Swiss-Prot record:
The lineage of its organism: Eukaryota, Fungi, Dikarya, Ascomycota, Pezizomycotina. Belongs to the IML1 family. It holds the Pfam family DEPDC5_CTD. PROSITE patterns: DEP. Residues 1-68, 106-136, 1363-1386, 1671-1749 are annotated as: Disordered. GO terms for biological process: intracellular signal transduction; negative regulation of TORC1 signaling; positive regulation of autophagy. Residues 52-62 have a biased composition (Basic residues). It comes from Pyricularia oryzae (strain 70-15 / ATCC MYA-4617 / FGSC 8958). SMART domains: DEP. This is Vacuolar membrane-associated protein IML1.
Length: 1874
């Protein structure tokens, strides 16, 4: 059943709702029905439709082959949805064939079926389907399609009598009952009635790139049956649900997903930004409706309805709401002096029309990225802001201009001038509508940076009190259009008033004069009220409103010819154009129902099939008082129906002549081309006749024009007997060939061919086009133009095209074979056209137009498409003389185009061409007064009109015509989102609830004329990288092509389908690959076209293995010289935390740099390239934030929190190392080590207890990160004894000797190592020893075995006891010698504090004194110049820039210009050279698909820290291109789960620092906090040198500010670039340090903080924090914390074991957000002493800052449960309290102890004898942590962790003195040095 036979079908809403049938639908109507038996060729696409039409309805049941079967429901899980026992069926059913299951209706007679649990959710907003779609439930709603699959033999044995085996979820969805009867019906897969035209899928809580969508459609949907409610799993992890299935616009339950099916993806977890235009009308009353204030309609009507919809559908959107307005200022003086008298820097600009007042734009952020569940608080904030918004923006200029104005001398009696300025909000029409959209596009223009892996989709909704008409600036419109057509942002406009009577949305802009045109060329022509533009017409759809005339252009049409030049040149200054944008879609809030939005895309007259009510029951709306008093005028010019639009008008008078009757005459050298254009009616002159004599030249037997007109008048004079409604009748004159000439003083320009198929006609007969061929092989100088039909879009007046060709121009495919009749499907390779300066006086170029073979074949083909001749277009370089082209006056056209041959006679007799003029006169009946526009010169840049023409449909809004709106152009990118034609006037909420992604396909493609003249080409070839034998299984060319397509999908490209491509290349058919087919082959000659914005990519398979890429780029737009649009936009923005509006300068004019696609494609092809910024690759940064664990993984091990975090980092490193991808080129080096390094050391992270800048400044010589020290590959050198060791035969002496060899000789690195304040001499770390043993033992295969062997080599506890006994029994020399030998056989090394066994990790060990080599006498004060080189995986190399610029690791001889007080400077080493380069991070290739779920490589670049302080954040960064995002999210969630087990929280944070957020998002700004009292100059002594034993005074900057941040639980995130030594080249694997300020992050991860150079704080919420995996864990942790808090309060632990410190153990135990910096260290029982002791931690980072009376405890509990604003308010309160600050400063100074004797603690010993019962040990391997954060079993353990000092028991804590505590607090260094 044809869709047009149905009534008006109100279809479901969509984000981009079409206005009529699509071009594909109309094309389908003309395509013959598809033969069911015809073979399917997925790799060949003709110029026919892309979506097949439903030509057949299913036959009646009694006429089909069907079988009644009994259903058996499979209750268990099964991958197969339907199985058949083919042994019980005849041979007619084959596996793989398509069948349908029809469920008979229920006995009650009702066809309602039982829905799945999710069905209500899917159908909730599909309630307006009419009866034609929902009535036939027996064949539609209860009909399930499936592909036949036979049961297995085992199942047949178990269930021999089962015929039909159906999965449970399918049975429930379609109402199949166990044991019930259904009908099996064979189906044909090629039948269009069962192939889905659109399939809609919804998903949430994940980021799906468009490349993932394409792969999901091909992998899980293509060539399969689908049904509503079906859940799709792609790669086992990407989940989506089919929410709707459409067959030819009809909603069905099940269908077949074929090659023409278009998938639509909708996100249920997107980002929404709502703009509310607070124009003057927002405070007006709704006089036409309810009478309430407009804003109340928004906040009480629309928004609650929207949020309730979201809640009902359980959507998870993030919402931001911005109020915006434009304030105009009445200065009281003339406009010329307004900006100069005042300060023009304050104003944003000046209105270009109307009052021309200066104005300023305001933006108020009310809500910033709140979840949609908080909609009640959102509405509260909106209502509160409404009360003060108008006041704030109206009075802002008084405060802003006050310091700029000077009071006059009479100031005592006269007010300042700025107070006399009257500020008033502008009307919605003159508001900052485009500017707001432009700002929104800049917010999401860089969504590939800081990629949120939890959300997909961006939608911008603008709510306006206007009617949808906006007066804009042309340059702003062009810039916004170019920005929006290249991204996937959807813009929805919601208007509050009623629907207007004209087309909307409408942009009204002033005409931009063409650059460099003569005065005569600037004459603009007038257009009929239905006229709309072509691409090349500068006066597109314009009409004059000058001199106060009517908006209708026809009143100026009576100006005599050649008289109106001056008038029109003056009128052109005020000429306006009206345009419908394809990227903006409008709805109207009626307020009558929560269920509907009135929709208006184009005026109702533009609908091709409007309903009867809209025509007969016209609702009169008029707000003009005079017209209300006089009643509405019955007739006016706009409402009068044009004569030829009357159904009874003789159509054939205005239809084009057939090809056979298309007369041409060549008389005396003059070629006459009949003008088939409809000329202007009343003032068009007919050349050749002195008087109108229609019958003079009539042929015998032919009815004259006069007879036709007489019959028409007679018909109209008699009233019909009965009135009947005549609907839309398709016309057959759409493909008229219109040609006209131009005047010239010397010779006439070339005639142009202009034709365009009408876009909405459903039936059109093919009409041949007039083509040409050259006589001498040279191509004529012709330019094609496009006309959009008979009425409304106008005809372009031609002129000879001239251009300065500076780049390669695109020519249509030159195909001589096509001219000669060849039908080769391959496009001819395009070659650049080299233009030479020449004139166009060649007679060959002006040959008469003749019929071409293409035109003849076009007549036979049955296509109504535009067929262009296969010839290139040559462009001349010379600039044509001004007299060569001159436009005639308005309404005057030469009747025929006369092309003069060289030397032809200037005049010709009238009788010679009267027959030609007779055909011309037939086209000159009194029809609609069409005018012609001028055609601009073809230049290297586009004219202003051509720049926006593809994306803006320009027309007369008051009377657009139905057959002139081509939605392929109007909704080019969003066309395939619309499953149904929008004949309804009510849309639903789908677009506002679930925004759709940009479709994968489009039919929009430039015409051949545009393609030839407006595009330039860049070709290159891409081939797969084959690296000899090292390459893994090479990709095929098909796989490479898929990767190239996938990459472009993710960058916003769409695949061009349909006939437009073949048309543009002048061919009937092209070999186009089918991207939605599973088994399409990439043969030579196959092409794929992809487009985005003004860029087109053609991917072609060539040369057997290569892919040729042709990039077609549209020429840049012409920048008009008279534009005064500033390059910098200057609005006033008030963010959510600002107190007032702040003037901002935003660059919205600079375009984004173009990508280097050649480089990108080479990267995808496998060439060893690095990601660069031009790639626009996806990236995200994560930090592991230390938190306080409540339990340990292994309580028996006695590990503490810092030790646990180090272990967690090591475990993550092992995980990364396990799934690390090693390129084949590096694999050969990886195999050089002994036994190929079976178990490499994970990442070799260097752990320090200082910040990176301090470590680099103090320990540069021994730092193992210097570039150049790692190139030697330590493991390539083995021990010097030429053989390896074995576990079975160990010689400890030889082993100890080998271990202590120098590193270059194969030994283990021994060096002095500092942990906090203790310096351990000549020690090694456990991980280095594990690596060494794996290299030098033959029978060790894993790190676990090496660790076990290390414990064997450790000195045991029994040996320690024996040592003490032997020392007491010295007289037994014999026994002593015997025991000594036993000891030597038991172990060779020991832990530096004799507290732990041997472990793999950051644990310090020393060779025992029995085996240790003696050190030189001067070693004590020597700085070891050896650099420790941990075992880094061999293939991990620094970036190529580092390799290319590798330099010596010596320090620079240049003097540092930076003071040591601000930037630490590394000591100058004795050897000279350039700056040493320190790499603080490494990068590896990580495989996120280690389970091999994907068919393609899924690898990312993982950057990780090499230098880490366990008290700070550990940094990760991931970069990727062309990787499935859900696999990345799964990997990140796995890392987060692993890290949470070891006391760390994985949080995503912005890559850029907090102070630069406004550069990316103008609606966000860090909140500044100033200190009420400046810090004192005096500071505690806190700096220690690694080789000194006494504290050194260093003027640490911002010491007190950092202490305040620690007080509020912030930890170090990233240091500023100035923090590092200036004489060291510090780099990361991703680039140089770029932070201006040092950044900190709250332990919760929800807040960032920076300290400025002035000592102020900048606070910014981390909006990237959204951790779905941790939400449940955090809730569980908080519940546990509450229980522990209750237990502690009952037990009184706060005053006993914890010293009564506020926020100490309570906070550490209660919240995972609390910091180790808040803990007390071994406090005494006295609360007073404890409070003083805790205060000292401000300088060392161990404890909470002073202020026992300040309730930090309660504040921190609030922080963990509330939003970031709570932390900010608490911190702001503290910083603004002078008393609290003074107390804080004084306690920090008073509690800082003096230097302690270094010898008592820092004595140089080989093995420390410090016991656990002698008090706090400050010098230890791993720092101590608060007792409250550890299990009770660990508090009494004497062995608390490897390398850690033991936490004393509560008894030991009570006996310690305050002096000992103060000393311990001082000596333990914090994570941040001051």
């Amino acid at each position: 059943m044809h869709r047009n036979a149905r009534g008006n079908v109100p279809g479901p809403s969509s984000l981009r709702q079409s206005i009529g049938t699509t071009k594909a639908d109309r094309d389908r109507d003309r395509v013959p029905s598809v033969d069911a038996g015809a073979p399917r060729t997925p790799d060949t696409t003709t110029s026919s439709s892309t979506t097949r039409h439903m030509h057949h309805q299913p036959h009646p049941r009694n006429g089909r082959q069907e079988r009644k079967c009994t259903v058996t429901v499979n209750e268990s899980f099964s991958r197969d949805e339907v199985l058949l026992n083919l042994d019980l069926f005849d041979n007619g059913i084959k596996p793989g064939s398509l069948m349908a299951i029809e469920v008979p209706p229920e006995k009650s007679g009702h066809a309602s079926l039982r829905k799945m649990p999710t069905q209500d959710h899917l159908d909730r907003d599909d309630s307006s389907m009419d009866a034609s779609q929902t009535g036939s439930t027996t064949t539609t709603d209860r009909r399930y399609l499936f592909i036949v699959k036979d049961m297995s033999k085992d199942m047949k044995l178990r269930h021999p009598k089962v015929e039909l085996y159906v999965a449970k979820h399918v049975a429930e969805a379609f109402g199949m009952k166990k044991g019930g009867h259904v009908y099996l019906i064979p189906e044909d897969a090629n039948n269009p009635s069962i192939e889905a035209s659109h399939v809609e899928l919804s998903f949430r809580d994940q980021y799906l790139s468009r490349a993932d969508m394409w792969r999901m459609a091909v992998g899980e949907l293509s060539e399969r049956t689908v049904y509503q409610g079906q859940v799709i799993y792609f790669l086992g992890t990407c989940k989506a649900q089919i929410s709707a299935v459409f067959v030819d616009g009809r909603k069905v339950r099940s269908a077949f997903f074929g090659r023409h099916t278009r998938p639509i993806y909708r996100s249920e977890s997107a980002r929404y930004i709502l703009f509310i235009q607070m124009s003057r009308e927002m405070w007006d009353f709704d006089s036409d409706g309810s009478g309430e204030i407009m804003f109340n309609k928004v906040v009480n009507g629309f928004l609650p309805a929207l949020f309730k919809k979201w809640m009902a559908l359980k959507l998870k959107h993030l919402v931001s709401i911005v109020l915006f307005a434009r304030v105009e200022y009445d200065t009281g003086i003339s406009t010329e002096f307004a900006e100069t008298a005042l300060h023009d820097s304050y104003f944003t600009g000046t209105q270009k029309s109307g009052s021309k007042r200066p104005y300023k734009d305001f933006y108020r952020v009310v809500v910033s990225e709140k979840t949609s569940v908080e909609w009640t608080s959102i509405l509260y904030h909106l209502k509160r802001e409404f009360g003060i918004f108008r006041r704030d923006i109206s009075l802002h200029h008084q405060q802003a201009l006050n310091p700029m104005q000077s009071v006059s001398e009479e100031g005592a009696t006269k007010q300042p001038y700025h107070r006399q300025i009257r500020a008033e909000s502008s009307l919605a029409t003159h508001g900052n509508f485009l500017e707001a959209i432009n700002l929104a596009s800049t917010v999401y223009a860089h969504d590939y940076i800081d990629r949120d892996l939890m959300r997909t989709g961006i939608s911008v909704v603008v709510i306006s009190p206007g009617a949808g008409v906006f007066e804009v600036d042309y340059e702003e419109l062009r810039r916004t259009t170019e920005a929006l057509v290249g991204n996937g942002i959807g813009i929805d406009l919601i208007c509050v008033p009623k629907i207007p009577l004209h087309s909307v949305p409408l942009f009204r802009y002033k005409k931009v004069p063409e650059k460099g045109r003569r005065h005569s060329e600037k004459i603009k022509t007038h257009f009929h009220d239905g006229s709309t533009p072509k691409y090349h017409t500068p006066a597109i759809g314009s009409y004059t409103s000058a001199l106060g005339s009517s908006l209708s252009p026809t009143k100026n049409m009576s100006v005599p010819p050649r008289v109106e030049s001056s008038l029109m040149s003056h009128a052109s200054n005020d000429e306006w154009s009206y345009a419908l944008p394809q990227w903006l879609h409008v709805s109207y809030w009626t307020g009558n129902s929560d269920e509907a939005l009135s929709y208006q895309g184009i005026a109702l007259s533009a609908s091709d099939n409007t309903c009867q009510d809209s025509q007969d029951e016209f609702a009169i709306r008029c707000r003009m008082y005079d017209l209300q008093m006089r009643s509405v005028l019955e007739t006016n010019e706009i409402e009068t129906t044009p004569l030829h639009a009357d159904p009874s008008f003789p159509r054939k008078l205005i239809q084009p002549l057939p090809l056979a009757k298309f007369r041409r005459f060549d008389v005396d050298g003059i070629t006459l081309i009949p003008n088939l254009r409809h000329t202007g009616g009343l003032v068009d002159h007919v050349s050749g006749f002195q008087k109108f004599a229609p019958d003079k030249h009539a042929k015998p037997g032919e009815k004259t024009i006069w007879r036709h007109l007489q019959e028409y008048d007679d018909t109209k004079a008699h009233l019909p007997a009965s009135r009947r409604h005549l609907g839309f009748r398709p016309q057959n004159n759409a493909d008229n060939v219109r040609m006209h000439g131009v005047e010239s003083g010397s010779y006439l320009g070339a005639s142009m061919i202009s034709e365009r198929r009408v876009s909405i006609n459903h039936h059109q007969s093919p009409h041949p086009s007039v083509s040409s061929k050259t006589s001498s092989g040279k191509t004529p100088k012709f330019m094609r133009q496009i006309s959009l039909g008979q009425r409304g879009f106008g005809i372009a007046a031609p002129k000879v095209a001239v251009a300065e060709v500076q780049v390669e121009n695109v020519a249509a495919a030159t195909s001589m074979a096509a001219v000669s009749g060849s039908r080769s499907p391959l496009p001819v390779r395009m070659t650049p056209i080299k233009s030479n300066p020449q004139t166009s006086q060649s007679p060959q170029a002006l040959t008469a137009i003749r019929d071409s073979p293409i035109a003849e074949r076009a007549q036979e083909s049955g296509r109504s498409s535009r067929l262009a001749p296969s010839r290139p277009i040559h462009i001349r370089n010379n600039v044509q003389s001004s007299d060569s082209t001159l436009f005639g006056t308005v309404g005057t056209m030469i009747s025929s185009s006369v092309i003069r041959h060289a030397g032809a006679a200037p005049d010709a007799p009238e009788i010679k061409y009267s027959n030609a003029l007779r055909a011309e006169d037939a086209q000159k009946v009194g029809i609609s007064k069409l005018r012609a526009g001028e055609m601009p010169d073809q230049q290297a840049i586009l004219s202003p009109s051509a720049a926006v023409s593809p994306w803006l449909t320009v027309l007369n809004p008051c009377n657009p015509e139905a057959n002139k709106v081509d939605e392929t152009n109007l909704y080019s990118r969003w066309q395939h989102v619309f499953p149904q034609p929008s004949e309804m006037k009510v849309m639903k909420w789908k677009s506002l609830c679930t925004p759709a992604a940009v479709p994968l396909t489009t039919e929009h493609f430039p015409t051949q004329a545009q393609f030839d003249s407006e595009y330039q080409r860049q070709p290159y070839n891409v081939s797969q990288e084959f690296d000899d034998e090292l390459t893994e299984e090479p990709k095929t060319r098909e796989e490479l092509l898929k990767e190239l397509i996938s990459l472009r999908f993710s960058q916003g490209f769409q695949v061009v389908v349909g006939q437009a491509v073949a048309k543009a290349f002048g061919q009937k058919q092209m070999k186009i690959a089918d991207i939605l087919s599973r088994d399409h082959s990439a043969e030579d000659g196959t092409s794929i076209f992809l487009s985005v914005g003004n860029t087109i990519h053609q991917l072609s398979c060539v040369n057997g293995t290569e892919v040729e890429v042709n990039i077609f780029t549209r020429k840049p737009a012409l920048q008009a010289s008279n534009l005064e649009q500033p390059e910098v936009y200057k609005p006033a923005i008030r963010t959510i935390m600002d107190e007032d509006y702040v003037a901002r300068q935003i660059d919205i004019a600079t375009p984004k740099p173009e990508r280097n696609w050649n480089y990108i494609d080479s990267y995808v092809a496998g060439h060893d390239l690095e990601l660069s910024e031009s790639f626009r690759f996806w990236r995200a940064r994560f930090v592991l934030i230390p938190i306080v664990n409540r339990t340990s993984l292994d309580p028996a091990a006695g590990e503490k929190e810092e030790e646990t975090r180090i272990e967690g980092t090591r475990r993550l490193g092992k995980l990364w190392q396990k799934h690390r991808y090693i390129p084949p080129s590096d694999r050969r080096f990886q195999d050089l080590g002994p036994r190929h390094r079976k178990d490499p050391n994970p990442l070799d992270i260097v752990y320090k207890t200082d910040d990176p800048s301090v470590v680099i400044a103090a320990e540069l010589e021994t730092l193992p990160l210097l570039e150049g020290l790692e190139a030697g590959h330590r493991r390539a050198q083995l021990v010097t004894n030429k053989h390896q060791f074995r576990k079975s035969s160990l010689n400890l002496a030889q082993l100890a000797e080998a271990i202590q060899q120098p590193v270059e000789n194969g030994g283990v690195r021994m060096q002095n190592r500092r942990w906090h304040l203790r310096l351990h001499y000549n020690c090694f770390i456990g991980s280095d020893m594990i690596d060494w043993m794996l290299d030098n033992f033959e029978d060790l295969d894993s790190r676990e075995e090496a660790e076990a062997l290390g414990n064997v080599l450790m000195i045991s506890d029994e040996d320690k006891l024996k040592d003490k006994e032997k020392d007491k029994d010295k007289e037994k020399d014999k026994d002593k010698e015997k025991e000594g030998s036993t000891r030597r056989e038991s172990g060779i090394f020991v832990h530096v504090e004799k507290r732990h066994r041997f472990k793999d990790g950051q644990y310090f060990y020393q060779i025992s004194s029995d085996f240790a080599k003696p050190q030189p006498s001067t070693w004590f004060n020597q700085r070891w110049r050896e650099a420790s080189v941990p075992s880094t995986p061999i293939s991990e190399q620094p970036p190529r820039e580092s390799i290319r610029n590798s330099i010596s690791h010596t320090l620079s001889e240049e003097e540092s210009l930076t003071s040591g007080a601000t930037t630490p400077t590394a000591p100058i080493l004795p050897y000279g050279g350039n700056k040493p380069r320190v790499m603080l991070s490494k990068v590896m290739k990580y495989d996120v698909d280690h389970r091999k779920r994907s068919y393609r490589p899924e690898r990312i670049d993982l950057h990780y820290d090499r230098l880490h302080n366990p008290d700070n954040c550990y940094h990760l960064r991931i970069d990727w291109m062309n990787v499935t995002a859900k696999l990345i999210e799964d990997a990140v969630e796995g890392w987060a789960r692993e890290a949470s087990l070891y006391g760390m929280r994985l949080v995503e944070v912005p890559i850029a620092e907090a102070c630069t957020i406004s550069d990316v998002n103008p609606f966000r700004k860090p909140f500044p906090i100033k200190l009420a009292v400046p810090p004192p100059d005096r500071q505690p002594v806190t700096f220690y040198d690694p080789t000194s034993f006494s504290p050194l005074a260093q003027p640490a900057r911002l010491f007190y500010q950092k202490a305040i941040l620690r007080k509020f639980d912030f930890v170090l995130d990233m240091e500023s670039a100035s923090s590092f030594p200036s004489n060291v080249d510090v780099t990361y694997s991703w680039g140089k340090p770029e932070f201006k300020y040092t950044q900190y992050i709250h332990r919760s991860g929800i807040l960032l903080a920076e300290i400025t150079d002035e000592g102020d704080f900048l606070i910014l919420a981390n909006r990237l924090y959204s951790n779905r995996a941790q939400a449940a864990r955090d809730k569980e942790m908080r519940k546990e914390e509450e229980q522990q808090q209750h237990k502690h309060r009952q037990g009184g632990a706060g005053a006993g074991g914890n010293g009564g410190l506020p926020g100490h153990s309570h906070v550490a135990d209660l919240t995972p957000l609390s910091s180790p910096l808040f803990r007390a260290v071994n406090t005494t029982g006295s609360p007073k002493t404890a409070g003083q002791g805790a205060a000292g931690a401000g300088s060392h980072g161990n404890n909470i800052a002073p202020g026992g009376e300040h309730n930090v405890h309660s504040a921190l509990i609030k922080f963990s449960l509330d939003e970031p604003n709570s932390i900010r308010l608490e911190m702001e309160k503290f910083c603004h309290d002078p008393v609290a600050l003074e107390a804080f400063y004084s306690e920090l100074l008073d509690r800082a102890p003096g230097p302690q004797p270094a010898s008592s603690i820092m004595a140089p010993t080989i093995i420390s004898q410090t016991g656990s019962g002698t008090g706090p040990v400050a010098d230890h391997n791993i720092p101590s942590f608060p007792s409250g954060g550890l299990p009770q079993g660990l508090l009494s353990s004497s062995v608390a962790g490897d390398g850690l000092s033991v936490i004393p028991s509560p008894v030991q804590q009570r006996v310690q003195s305050p002096a000992v505590l103060a000393a311990s607090q001082l000596l333990r260094r914090g994570s941040v040095q001051y």
